[in-house]
Amino acid sequence: YMAEGIYPYFREIEGKQGTEVLMGGHRVLMFGSNAYTGLTGDDRVIEAGVAAMRKYGSGCAGSRFLNGTLDIHVQLEKELAAFVGKEEALCFATGFTVNSGVIPCLTGRGDYIICDDRDHASIVDGKRLSFSQNLKYKHNDMADLEKQLQKCNPDAIKLIIVDGVFSMEGDLANLPEIVRLKHKYNASIMVDEAHGLGVFGKQGRGVCDYFGLTNEVDLIMGTFSKSLASIGGFIAADKSIINWLKHNARTYIFSASATPAATASALEALHILQQEPERLENLWNVTNYALKRFRESGFEIGATESPIIPLYVRDTEKTFMVTKLAFDEGVFINPVIPPACAPQDTLVRFALMANHTHEQVDEAIQKLTKVFKQLELL
């Protein structure tokens, strides 16, 4: 793909990430970002990070376990726990290390982890590091989930782990049915809200809140690198679970803590999310507009119910070609190929932010229609 000039990765951005970015000196429409709330370039979020660096320095030079706990880490944890409706929360330096560190602590030999086969790679790595038996069910197939639960020893721990919003396809977990099966088989549930936080539920509290099932979900995970305009992640649960994780999650104990700037920026973004409900309204306005326009234009967009819109190509090379030709037209989108999806499900991922306009969506769809027709995909 490099020789053909269609290698689509590591493209350099020369400034802030907003709805438009500068790349190679040219204006490019950004539809490849996870910044759903549109806060990565917000002056208040930036200033909060700058002020924290001035107060605390550039880094913590230690683990949370030792010298790396700042008062703003604890403040962010308290506010996140209240926001998602759990007793306590624990912050990690990245979202990936939440899943890869927390999951191995929750089950042991003779226990079971049951995952959707489209769950994020960090969940996959987390379950690989556990000593439990790992089962998976077909994507959002509740009959298959029940079949996997029936294989489990009824007396063992059974942990169902699921993405609230699936990061490539944009569809939601069938949380009401998962909760019903949890009770039927005496299981527990962990929901990864990486792409649900800031998007679904009251004030963007996530998919668990959207379904009104926060109290039925045992652990809620989230990241700061998407709607909270920073980097890092957290797990929220009952006090006893958080205390156990504090003293056992290796990625928490043996990693340096999140930087002051990252922590303060996430905290400020969380405040803005709660103070500006119109941000969420704007996101859903432009999302619904884009969904309608893509369907009218004949694109295959699957079962998405979110600002993540998959444009199915179903061919790896053509997926790369779409990405390259769209970029040449001034539209940044992301290619999704195996192992992030099945070989027959390759797609380009088009994602929206709260500050995208209808005009930007129209321009992008016009250019993508041209590209898809050029490759005989429309």
Regions found by a protein language model. Name each.
Residues 47, 51-95:
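Conserved N-terminal alpha-helix of the aminotransferase class I/II PLP-enzyme fold
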Residues 185-188, 195, 200-305:
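Active-site C-terminal subdomain of aminotransferase-like
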